[in-house]
């Protein structure tokens, strides 16, 4: 499967009759079967870029190649579960009954560690468990690309680390292309095969990480230097 390519993509919003350019001339290759992370501070255009690639919003200039032919799923910051549905029903929600592969769904439920909560309702789940259901729902759709908009940002530190590990394990087992938005440099370094640093609507820098996620030590000199470079890119003091 091929990836997705953005060529000179720009996006404008009109606020009180004033045109504001949110994204400016974005050129980007999003590889298949990898985790590509869009990193930047709040308001830099991360979510807008994700929504353009997913087709939830239209762009004003440029071209996005290869996105229309892809099956895409979306994981939001909020879990967006249906409170009256149990875990399995939430995971299969939105999939046509004839298209549901129950064996695959059961495998995904086991993979995300929710086998014991098969018949549980959202009110009976912790925040981390709810996000596991959201991730499982995305993978159950059998997508080519999963768009993840800061899915772990509302979780506590320890649950967030656990969910990062879970995502890497699921990605390794089920194989899918992921476009992941975050404002956390450490999260980008843990998850990303490719990191896109976005600042004020433009791509400031791009980094590719060769080490497998399980082999990464953020205290290693290489990652310490890379983190410092990204901080410089973002002009964070």
Locations of regions flagged by a protein language model:
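Catalytic Walker B motif of ABC-type/P-loop ATPase nucleotide-binding domains
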Residues: 146-149
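Conserved ABC ATPase "signature" region
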Residues: 100-117, 169
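A short, proline-enriched helix->beta-strand linker immediately N-terminal to the Walker B motif
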Residues: 140-144
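Hydrophobic anchor residue at the start of the ABC signature
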Residues: 135
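Helix-to-loop junction immediately C-terminal to a conserved catalytic motif
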Residues: 54
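Conserved ABC ATPase signature
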Residues: 121-125, 129
């Amino acid at each position: 499967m091929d990836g997705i390519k953005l060529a000179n993509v720009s996006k404008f919003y009109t606020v009180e009759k004033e045109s504001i350019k949110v994204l400016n001339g974005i050129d980007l290759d999003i590889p298949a079967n990898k985790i590509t992370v869009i990193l930047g501070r709040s308001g830099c255009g991360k979510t807008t870029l994700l929504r353009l690639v997913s087709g939830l919003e239209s762009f004003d200039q440029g071209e996005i190649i290869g996105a229309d032919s892809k099956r895409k799923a979306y994981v939001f910051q909020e879990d967006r579960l249906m409170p009256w549905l149990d875990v399995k029903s939430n995971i299969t929600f939105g999939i046509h009954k004839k298209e549901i592969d129950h064996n695959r769904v059961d495998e995904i439920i086991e993979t995300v560690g929710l086998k014991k909560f098969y018949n549980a309702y959202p009110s009976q789940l912790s925040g981390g468990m709810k996000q596991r259901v959201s991730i499982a729902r995305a993978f159950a759709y059998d997508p080519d690309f999963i768009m993840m908009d800061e899915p772990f940002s509302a979780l506590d530190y320890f649950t967030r680390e656990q969910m990062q590990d879970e995502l890497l394990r699921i990605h390794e087992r089920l194989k899918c292309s992921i476009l992941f938005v975050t404002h956390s440099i450490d999260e980008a370094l843990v998850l990303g095969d490719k990191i896109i640093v976005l600042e004020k609507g433009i791509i400031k820098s791009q980094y590719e990480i060769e080490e497998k996620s399980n082999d990464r030590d953020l205290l290693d000199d290489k990652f310490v230097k890379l983190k410092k470079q990204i901080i410089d890119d973002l002009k964070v003091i």
